[in-house]
């Protein structure tokens, strides 16, 4: 049975149109951790929010040229200071995983929730981010029992060779200690 839980009460809701319905009767059974910063390695900018809300100015920085026309989203984005922005209700399919496979199944967006951390693969994440991520993860584990600890993965795990996030700087044991 699909949980009615759609919005995290500690998150600021943000407008986003880059999502659609999950396949009928699809059970949410995977949590995917990502990282993002725009420009890469710069924090506290409005550009990630602009990307997910579809208003990014692709001329604002030379590295944004590849973002022209890109339609991507995540369910949530956790900033460095720990604030959580939510773009897509959990019962809807966000467009975060791209070409992906987990446990023999393709199209991970169909059955996953995507959480973006503001960061890079090699920059340590903040204490506030781990706290916010653990609070959100605990809530998701309660609401979606098919998400088990072994089904909390990085983007690198579902798209190896294509993606590397959340990277070597992400402390998996720290997250799992916090969600016990």
Regions found by a protein language model. Name each.
Residues 33, 115, 133:
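Conserved, mostly hydrophobic/aromatic
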Residues 35-36, 117, 156:
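Residues immediately flanking
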